[in-house]
């Protein structure tokens, strides 16, 4: 799973119990969360994980939201973890971006967009974005060279251009989503499966040059399938600007009908955001 955004989604007792029940029902032996648990790793994410791991073994890697308030050294301690399940190894790390998904704009233009619009302007990274990505790629290749057997990779950022924004307004933000260079390494070292998130769109699993990609982030509640479906089932609550996700969610979030609807359909939403991989 990825992109639970516990704070933004107000993950309370009901949501946590629904998640625990789903994992048990699906027979999950190990849960990995590929970043963006919350905006506060220490006070929100780690206590959540500590409670959850009393019921199921789990691991995680950082997303950009998890990095808020962390030093570069603290960020690095969570990177490049390797776990073994049978013959299969799970490699987890955050990833990053180098603007290469939007090559037509200059570095200065990307920095202006980032400063004006993007969450990561709040982070205190030690190096610039292309340098962070280059360092990450070097570390990743050095690690992959040492591994044999089937490899699963979990990262937060987007490793292939097929998953980018296609809407003209949002295309400039593709610069901050990831880098195709990750995919090239996955192909080179015959990585079997890759799970990632960051961009809150869910895709069917697909194989690209021998690598099977899984992108099923939970995302923000305003983006959830159950939120969209609520308006179809209760059209009287539709607003004129339905394309504005914040506004349409604000119009329903306090409705008794929506609270009941969410309770009824939350399990299905969580299940749709779960990627299950059977290992050798």
Model features per residue range: what roles?
Residues 1-54, 67-69, 118-123, 270, ...:
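N-terminal active-site segment of His-dependent metallophosphoesterases
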Residues 1-2, 31-36, 58-64, 77-79, ...:
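Active-site neighborhood of phospho(di)ester-bond hydrolases with catalytic His/Asp-centered motifs
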Residues 1-8, 87-95, 152-154, 212-217:
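Active-site-proximal beta-strand elements of phosphoester/diester hydrolases
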Residues 6-10, 38-44, 65-71, 83, ...:
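Active-site environment of divalent metal-dependent phosphoester hydrolases
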Residues 20-23, 74-87, 91, 136-149:
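Short amphipathic alpha-helices and their capping/turn segments at secondary-structure boundaries
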Residues 52, 59, 86-89, 160-245:
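Conserved beta-sheet core of the metallophosphoesterase superfamily
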Residues 91-148, 157-169, 241, 247-254:
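Active-site-proximal loop/helix segment associated with metal-binding centers of metalloenzymes
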Residues 133-137, 237-280:
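A short C-terminal boundary segment appended to hydrolase-like catalytic domains
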């Amino acid at each position: 799973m990825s992109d639970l955004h516990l704070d933004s989604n107000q993950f309370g007792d009901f949501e946590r119990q629904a998640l625990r029940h789903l994992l048990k029902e699906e027979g999950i032996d190990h849960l990995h969360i590929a970043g963006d648990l919350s905006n506060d790793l220490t006070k929100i994410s780690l206590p959540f994980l500590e409670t959850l791991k009393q019921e199921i073994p789990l691991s995680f890697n950082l997303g950009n939201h998890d990095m808020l308030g962390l030093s570069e050294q603290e960020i690095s301690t969570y990177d490049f973890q390797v776990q073994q399940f049978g013959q299969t190894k799970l490699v987890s790390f955050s990833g990053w971006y180098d603007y290469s998904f939007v090559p037509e704009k200059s570095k200065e233009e990307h920095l202006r967009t980032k400063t004006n619009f993007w969450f990561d302007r709040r982070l205190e990274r030690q190096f610039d974005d292309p340098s962070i990505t280059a360092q990450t790629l070097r570390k990743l290749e050095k690690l992959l060279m040492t591994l044999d057997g089937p490899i699963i990779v979990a990262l937060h950022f987007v490793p292939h251009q097929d998953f980018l924004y296609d809407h003209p307004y949002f295309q400039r933000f593709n610069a901050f989503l990831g880098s195709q260079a990750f995919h090239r390494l996955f192909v080179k070292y015959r990585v079997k499966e890759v799970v990632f998130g960051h961009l809150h769109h869910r895709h069917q699993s697909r194989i690209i040059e021998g690598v099977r990609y899984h992108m099923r982030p939970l995302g923000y509640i305003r983006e959830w399938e159950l939120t969209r479906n609520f308006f179809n089932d209760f059209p009287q609550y539709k607003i004129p600007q339905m394309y504005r996700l914040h506004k349409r969610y604000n119009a329903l979030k306090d409705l008794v009908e929506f609270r009941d609807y969410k309770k009824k359909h939350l399990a299905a939403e969580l299940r749709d955001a779960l990627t299950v991989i059977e290992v050798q």
